[in-house]
Amino acid sequence: MEVLIWKARRMLESRQEGRVLLRCPIALGREPVGPKEREGDGRTPEGTYYICLIKEAGKYGKSLGLSYPSPEDAARGFAAGRIDEGALDAVRRAWANRVRPPWGTAL
């Protein structure tokens, strides 16, 4: 399955083998333009992620948790001094096991 997001249109599309399964509107962070760099910047991540959490009935309805940060996001954060080597390794392990990466980092 593939999930595509168009931030400018605020639209999500889910596809399987090229066939559209779902198309629906989405909500984004308070500052959706530009790449996400750190915790609290209000930006929506851009890149390739997997769904690591499905919340059926949250405050705003159903939500999908993305596997942010990715190893690439974490490597940039490590290079910029935002996270330490332990956090970088934790993100890499989470991605290797296809589980939720740590969300409590400075990213």
Where on the chain are the PLM-derived regions?
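Cell wall/extracellular polymer interaction/catalysis modules
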Residues: 1-107
